[in-house]
Amino acid sequence: MFQIIYRSKDNISFSEKELKRLLIRSRFRNGADGITGVLLLHEGMFLQALEGDEAAVKATFARIGLDSRHSEVCILGSGARSGEHRNFGKLAMGFVNAGDRTQLLSGFVEIPDVPDFSKLNVLAAMELLRWASERTSRMPAEALD
């Protein structure tokens, strides 16, 4: 099992429609590649964890790095882990928009104080991503699709 945790800046201020399109495509592609993970959006910054086969995760991350919708891509942590345990279960792309209070309310999510992603270390990032993944699975389908 291989994992990458990174942050990046949103260059285009995704509309809700653009975010949904991105998530649908990402979930399809990640599912086909056996990749799981979660994406958290807050104040124009993304925080994401990807996990799965090393080659598939690295290829996905390389594609993300070339995407002009992102900048300031910074790996917070990466590496192989022993065993097949996944931190994000079966989530091909869990997602929480921490700035969207209506999404959070519709999923009965209480949001903690979300720190500036540029100041997170890998342990704090992982804790925040686990928090997001726990909330993703409880959100209604219409908030995720």
Can you say where each PLM-predicted feature lies in the sequence?
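Charge-rich, low-complexity N-terminal segments
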Residues: M1-D145
